[in-house]
Structure formats: C-alpha cells, structure tokens
Amino acid sequence: MCIRDRFIIVIIMAILSNLELDNKSDITRIAHLACFIVIATITVATFVQTVNMLMTTINTMGTLMQVISPFLLSVLIATGKISTTGIIQPLLLFLASSVGFIVTYFVIPLLSISVAFNVICSISENIRLEKLSKFFSNVSLWTIGVVLTVFLGVLSLETSLSSSVDSLSVKTTQAAVSNFVPVVGKFFSDSFEVVVGATKIIGKTGGIIGILGIVIVGIIPIFKITSIMVIYMLLAAFVEMITTDKLILKYLSGFVNVYKTMLGILIGVVILFVISTGIILNLVNSIVT
C-alpha cells in the first residue's frame, strides 16, 4: 500500500474518532475498529518486511567479513604479526557468527514483543503497555551497544599488546639476518623491508575494499529504514493536528520508536564491522621496520 493510501486511512480514523467523541454510536466504533485493523495489518506487515531486510543485511555483512578476514589475516602473517593473528582470528570469527545470532534470536524477538505490546495497548485506553513496549525496544538497542563496546574494547586491548611483541620479533629477525648471515645478510634484511612494505600496500587495498563493501551493503537498508521512520513521524504529526484521539498518535509514535531502534541497531553493526576491519588495517600498517 502506498503512502497516500496510508494517509487516507489515518484521516478516516481521525474523523471517525472525532465523530465517536461527539456521538457514542456503535457504528462509528465498529468503523473505527475496522480502520485500526487495516492500519495494524499494514504496519505489522511493513515491520516484518523491514525485519527480514535487517536480518539479511546483517548476515550479508557477516558473510563479507568472513570472506575478507582470511585475506587480511594472511597479510598479518606475511608481515610477521603471528601473535596478533592468533588472537584476532577467533575474535573475528566470533564477531561474524555471533552478531547474526544475537540479532536473530535475541534482538528481533524483543522488537517483536515491543510491536505486539504497542498494537495491544492502542486498542483501548484502558490497556497501558506503552512503557513496557518502549522498554523492550530499548533493551534490544542496549544489547547491540554492549556487544559493540565489549568486543571493540577487547580487540583493541589484545591487539595493542600483541602488536608490540610482533614488532619486536620483526626487528629482532632483521637484526639477526643482517648481522649473522655472511655476505648476503644485509641484502636479505633490506629485501625483507621491501616485501613487508609491498604486503602492507596489498593489505591496505584489500581492507579498504572490505570496508567499502560493508558500507555499500548497509547504506541502502539504512536509507529505507530512515524513510519508513520519517513517514510514520509525518503521519503522527498530521494526526496530532486533526484529532484529539491519543490512541492513534500513541500507536504511530510507538512504531517511530521501533524504527529508531532498528536504525540504531543497523548503524551500530555497520560501525562494528568497519572499525574491526580498520583495526586490522592499522595493525598491517604498524609494522616497525
């Protein structure tokens, strides 16, 4: 259903609400309920489609992360970051698999419960579940925030420690080859620097391509969710001008909060993958020669 049809149905509901306030007729109540059922069906169907898009996007980014991770890890090994690779590899695999799992089996159910409570509490003023609906929506967003904070904190700490060890190992290897290998030791030491430099360039190029891929995958769903959220915000603002019915306004505002949460979750996951790839790029470029 197009945006125009949604506006028309909302206007009809607002008019019926005003008539219901003036005339307690069963016919107007039934008509109002019928319009609400139509709106609820449309909004829930849109929510389901958006959820499927969100899950597909996150799973695609996870798959992309699994594809570029072996390449970047190979670059780390080639540049002497053996200790770092041993730490980053399980963390990246955990990231790629766990984010999709958390979103699918924890975040999405919480959002679905939030939407269900929003629909139920909008049927009658005597049903008050809006606070509970907002709570479940906020918990789903907090979950992604905690995952992002903990993972990036651990990754940054571990890679900083292991990076120092690996850099020292690289310098020690160069010094040993240069000083103890007769005649050609200095040549091999200088060649090692050239190889490391070339490997860093290759790794940087691959990492940038990976970051661009993640951003491209995430940018279209971000715009779609933003547009849906703006539509509901406009509907809520329009309803507020033409009717005093708080149920319609509460219903639309509830979906605005849900889509804000979904937008925050998707942006958070994109940032998580981009920063993780950026940390690896920084490690590739931090080889001390």
State where each predicted segment sits.
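Membrane-interface helix-loop-helix junctions at boundaries between adjacent transmembrane segments
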Residues: 28, 32, 42-107, 121-136
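Short, small-residue-biased leader/transition segments that mark boundaries at the very start
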Residues: 1-3
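Residue-level signal for the membrane-embedded core of alpha-helical transmembrane segments
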Residues: 6-11, 38, 42, 69-72, ...
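Transmembrane alpha-helical segments and their short flanking loops
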Residues: 186, 190-194, 231-289
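Helical hairpin unit composed of two closely spaced alpha helices linked by a short loop
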Residues: 205-247
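Transmembrane helix-loop junctions in multi-pass membrane proteins
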Residues: 16-22, 45-55, 80-91, 121-129, ...
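Membrane-interface interhelical connector segments
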Residues: 163-201
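Loop-to-transmembrane-helix entry motif
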Residues: 61-68, 99-106, 136-150, 195-198, ...
